[in-house]
Amino acid sequence: MTATIIDTDLLTQARSAVETAQGVIHTGIATAKESGTADQDQQLVYSLAHAASAAAMAESALTYAQTGDDEARLAHVFIGRQLTDLASMLWARSSDWGVEPSALDATRAYAAQVTAPAFVGLAAAAPGSANLPDDLAMVATTFRQFANERVAPYAEAIHRHDLDIPQEIIDGVAELGCFGLSIPEEYGGSASGSEDDYMAMVIATEELSTASLGAGGSLITRPEILARAIEAGGTDEQKQQWLPAIASGETLCAVAVTEPDFGSDVANLKVSASPEEGGWRINGVKTWCTFAGRANALMVLARTNPDPEAKHRGLSLFVVDKPSDDGHDFRHEVNGGTLEGRAIATLGYRGMHSFEVSFTDWFVPAANLIGGEEGLGRGFYLQMAGFENGRIQTAA
């Protein structure tokens, strides 16, 4: 890092701007509470939540800005863009937030300065230091080397020809412990329960993605989601059965939530799981199930309560075992049921392949209902516990 000559005046302006933004957001939240219409105005609630998250990140950026000149420029650009986004939210709906349209005017000069092309260009030319402790810096170095040596040589061919990810990459990622970054040590993973667990996962994802998103960084997402769901609501037996296998890479995972007619509108999902002796029969179609071919375990969100009024409370989460398949399609007939998948052509996200998966009377043992009997109706909540971690990884 070069000698630090941080512009303290600009930093003071940034701090004042963030405080102004936080005040506007707090007023908006209070206004929404007082109106009693939050349930009816989900767009407003979403905007407030988005703005509050952005303001919290901007506040953290103020600390980062004090570590060096390059870091300060990056922080200023980030804060300026968050202020610009907030201003656009207020432009048409300031009255709903309980503030005047001019509420952010005091921040305009600062935002204009730090989002100007010349200023942004300086920030882009000097990305700054990651400021990682030694152990996490080693994580970055290890995965950067793996990405350069083992992933990058295959990346172009995988993308241009929509090839499968070579087993060499999957085995290498498993050997590095990638699939167990968020799985507790007692189940064969490396998570110790500290915030560094998240950082290690984010760093590994970033480094692998520099070589290839589809054939590197995104390999970790599905194991993260399923493992977190099992940790959040699985029985002790299920944790012992599945978590070590996920951590080692023996079990490769895919997620089956989205449906053709409903997207991710979870409350109205239709894929059903009907009880029968010893287990369940699943029927319906899921789509955008990335890695569903190669995976030998699908996390499936299905409706176990047929009453449509049950909405998201009528959903349960299953681990559906299947054979691992190469290529762009698969079909299996077992126990009187059929499981069939076809890859969906995608523009830039190749290697793992995203599938449409059809279940016809596909049998799932009772032991594969996450949480057992206590997991009935908890599928949405367990899925969200998984997605919470998976989305952090996806953002990386």
Where are these regions (language model features)?
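Amphipathic, small/basic residue-rich leader segments at the start of a protein or domain
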Residues: T2-A38, Q42-A49, T63-Q66, G98-I220, ...
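Glycine-rich beta->alpha junctions and the first turn(s) of the following alpha-helix
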Residues: T2-A56, G128-V139, N335-A396
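Short secondary-structure subsegments characteristic of cysteine-rich extracellular domains
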Residues: A58-T84
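N-terminal glycine-rich flavin-associated loop
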Residues: G216-D236, G263
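A short, Trp-centered hydrophobic/proline-enriched beta-strand micro-motif
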Residues: G249-V257
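A structural signal for short hydrophobic beta-strand segments in well-ordered beta-sheet cores
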Residues: V271-S274
